[in-house]
Amino acid sequence: MNVKVEDISSIKKKLSFEISVEAVDTEFSNEYKKLSKTAKIPGFRKGKVPRSVLERQYAGHVEGQVFERLVNETFFKALVDEKINAVSAPEVVDNGPLKPGQAFTYEAEVEVRPDVEAKDYIGLDLKKENFAVEDQDVEDRLQDMLKSRAKVEVSEREVAQAGDIAVIDFEGFVDGEAFAGGKAEGHELELGSNSFIPGFEDQVVGMECGQDKDIEVAFPEDYGNEELAGKPAVFKVRLNQIKERVLPALDEEFAKEAGLESVEDLKIKIRESIEGQERDRIEKDFRERMTDALIEANEFEVPEGMIDSQIDYMLKNLQNRMQAQGMRLEDMGINAESFRQIYREVAAKQVKASLILEAIALQENLKVEEDEIKDKLEEIVETSGAPKEAVMNYYSNDESRRGLVSQMAEEKVVAFLTGKAKIEMVDKEALENAKMTEE
């Protein structure tokens, strides 16, 4: 077998093969011998059918089998011999005739992993949000908790106000005609929730129980029903009843229901929770800004095969999470194909970032040591609450372990780059303004 390798681009190679007559004849001979054992030809016993008879009836089938075997065997051997890091299946772009007694030639193209040499990654100019939890943040979260445990009771008030739950009958009309789906009785509408057509809830505020009222609104231009989008409408509304949410008392009993001893302990817990959530959000945003800067400084092509693999990985993760919640992808209004289209650019960015971080790890000799892996596994056991044996068994799987090590390696590179970066701490508003300027 003779192989010639040519670079088509930085991410694609062409391999030209010439396979000897002997190798071709051996494959044809093996295929016909195998076929002779199973072929049913009138007048011949299995295993006794002459090759000439088989050739007349099965030549096309045998040629296809030999073609597939020769390409697979020679192509993947060439990848090893030539040390080619392929990231996609081969695409045969040309081939000569495949006949017994003749050498066989073919050409195949394959995408390869780009050879990335990272640059301009020391001293990145980055902005990072400076955040501190304010007392008002804690109070707001505390109010949310109280509201989530509120009881809905019939109000003694006769006039509806913002925040009330109005129990209404309504029927909508466009151009004087009732429309499908525009009528309901005993509908509970929280005033101020903005869950109805814009302007509707504001006009219910101030109505008295038992009052009838014509409410004039206009459907939004982007309304889901095209027949109603942008059109003015009149709703005939009757306010039947007013309900309100009664918050529980903020006392020791409430704190104990949340698993804490006092209101002060609850506030401390809430503060810690907010700090943790904000810290995660800020770190995620900071890492995105870092990878954006790295991608901008390091331009290179990314193989379509690597992007496809990343999209498949993202899709599988999403499907698994949704399945665990008893949901399907279609429940989000998308399917696998539309997901691939929507998130292709995101996947390409993730692949680029990963390749750059891997290159930096190699260039800076940043490695994940065995004792670091052990410490990480202990941390996973502690934070997840899962049995140690279960965690160790899961990460004894080669694929799971590689994923963990890859994640740890990226974290090590990010920590290295953070230590070398020029970081300006700014408030949230300044950071958002900077984002708008960059866009």
Curated annotation (Swiss-Prot):
Alphabetical keyword list: Cell cycle, Cell division, Chaperone, Cytoplasm, Isomerase, Rotamase
Main location: cytoplasm
Record's keyword annotation contains Zinc: no
Biological process annotations from GO: 'de novo' cotranslational protein folding; cell division; chaperone-mediated protein folding; protein transport; protein unfolding
UniProt-annotated location(s): Cytoplasm
GO CC list: cytoplasm
InterPro entries noted in UniProt: PPIase_dom_sf (IPR046357), PPIase_FKBP_dom (IPR001179), Trig_fac (IPR005215), Trigger_fac_C (IPR008880), Trigger_fac_C_sf (IPR037041), Trigger_fac_ribosome-bd_bac (IPR008881), Trigger_fac_ribosome-bd_sf (IPR036611), Trigger_fact/SurA_dom_sf (IPR027304)
Reactions performed catalytically: [protein]-peptidylproline (omega=180) = [protein]-peptidylproline (omega=0)
Transmembrane segments: none
Keyword Isomerase: yes
Record GO terms (molecular function): peptidyl-prolyl cis-trans isomerase activity; protein folding chaperone; ribosome binding
The PPIase FKBP-type domain, residue ranges: 163-248
Known EC number: 5.2.1.8
Any Pfam family matching the protein: FKBP_C
Top enzyme class: isomerase
Cited NCBIfam families: tig
Entry text on domains: Consists of 3 domains; the N-terminus binds the ribosome, the middle domain has PPIase activity, while the C-terminus has intrinsic chaperone activity on its own.
Family named by the database record: Belongs to the FKBP-type PPIase family. Tig subfamily.
Function: Involved in protein export. Acts as a chaperone by maintaining the newly synthesized protein in an open conformation. Functions as a peptidyl-prolyl cis-trans isomerase.
Protein name: Trigger factor
Annotated source species: Syntrophotalea carbinolica (strain DSM 2380 / NBRC 103641 / GraBd1) (Pelobacter carbinolicus)
Gene: tig
